[in-house]
Amino acid sequence: MEEEDEEARALLAGGPDEADRGAPAAPGALPALCDPSRLVHRLLVLLLMCFLGFGSYFCYDNPAALQTQVKRDMQVNTTKFMLLYAWYSWSNVVLCFFGGFLIDRVFGIRWGTIIFSCFVCIGQVVFALGGIFNAFWLMEFGRFVFGIGGESLAVAQNTYAVSWFKGKELNLVFGLQLSMARIGSTVNMNLMGWLYSKIEALLGSAGHTTLGITLMIGGVTCILSLICALALAYLDQRAERILHKEQGKTGEVIKLTDVKDFSLPLWLIFIICVCYYVAVFPFIGLGKVFFTEKFGFSSQAASAINSVVYVISAPMSPVFGLLVDKTGKNIIWVLCAVAATLVSHMMLAFTMWNPWIAMCLLGLSYSLLACALWPMVAFVVPEHQLGTAHGFMQSIQNLGLAIISIIAGMILDSRGYLFLEVFFIACVSLSLLSVVLLYLVNRAQGGNLNYSARQREEIKFSHTE
């Protein structure tokens, strides 16, 4: 206890006010990097937060990066291959409701983050062992375990962000976390195929063992995330002791009875969300072979173009977030994003134009939609129902991804890529129709979903008077 008191006194002696005035630090004061009240220390915490989710995002799309190898080495068709994505989503259909509850009421943010990071690590190891032992059912089980940790780890990551950063800083922090997640996905798409070829050359042949070892090496990124979780737990506990700050909480209150009170605009937002994302993530999961077969790309080039959605999303998500914040008009931005995605899929399906054009358009629209759609939930539900609304939205999104992943695999096995693209076009068209309905319903009800930023500021100001 005496050592802790001495550390606290040392930090307080060289507090931020003195540093800002250029006053000399008191004797025994610790450097700014060790002071949880200083910006430099919080930037260190931010770095750890960003890498906390890197491993799970890197490994999530391991199957997409190794689509050809998985199907060949494990001797499975596309329908079974897409189960690797479906099992990830199945585990989150229910868990999305309880991730925040487990962090707030059961584990706490520190232990919750560590436990969910362990699930991600264990899931990836089991997934890799399934390849080594030529047991596809074990790979499926590994993806299910991986999914248990993946989505909840993202909740924990956001909870840490809210605990350490406030106000305008928070939007930038969320943008940086999302960018790092997309970088993880991009690195995976462009690295895993190359890594497989190196392991193949080392072992002298392709096969399930080569696949398993490649996936196991990829799992090192999950260990990196676990190390970040442990470091964050230590730094957060230390900051709580020194600054007497409260441990971070999600603040989510989940009440399933709230579902009956959801308004029509909220249900339309749910439909837009599901119908849009089922035409993006399963497409990326199956995209590598599509670009190889239709456009004659090499394996490496196909991986590069398949990852361009994430490449664009990394820098553009914060930019579009700022744009939507400054302009408002969320429904119009969502309409533009969904319409652009529809054009992108139609170009890929019915033309032989350079697919880089369509994929860049898809990357821009995907980034814009996330920035404009998700904030609308807060405009149509009371604050006490936000936790339930977000949980339900994530739950049905995962349900849709689980079902559509299987259907997409079946269509590809029986009909080919053209029919699969037509199916994705139908999904995006339904999303577009829902956006138009949302615009009309919002206008008829006098809702605020399409207000400009100035109108929202005026309403907020009038309520404070």
UniProtKB/Swiss-Prot annotation:
It is a multi-pass membrane protein. It catalyses: L-alpha-aminoacyl-L-arginine(out) = L-alpha-aminoacyl-L-arginine(in); L-arginyl-L-alpha-amino acid(out) = L-arginyl-L-alpha-amino acid(in); L-arginyl-glycine(out) = L-arginyl-glycine(in); L-alpha-aminoacyl-L-lysine(out) = L-alpha-aminoacyl-L-lysine(in). The chain crosses the membrane at residues 39-59, 83-103, 113-133, 135-155, 170-191, 213-233, 266-286, 304-324, 331-351, 361-381, 392-412, 418-438. GO terms for cellular component: lysosomal membrane; lysosome. A motif (Dileucine internalization motif) lies at residues 11-12. Gene3D superfamilies: MFS general substrate transporter like domains. It is found in: Lysosome membrane. Homodimer. Interacts with lysosomal protein GLMP (via lumenal domain); the interaction starts while both proteins are still in the endoplasmic reticulum and is required for stabilization of MFSD1 in lysosomes but has no direct effect on its targeting to lysosomes or transporter activity. Lysosomal dipeptide uniporter that selectively exports lysine, arginine or histidine-containing dipeptides with a net positive charge from the lysosome lumen into the cytosol. Could play a role in a specific type of protein O-glycosylation indirectly regulating macrophages migration and tissue invasion. Also essential for liver homeostasis. This is Lysosomal dipeptide transporter MFSD1. It comes from Pongo abelii (Sumatran orangutan).
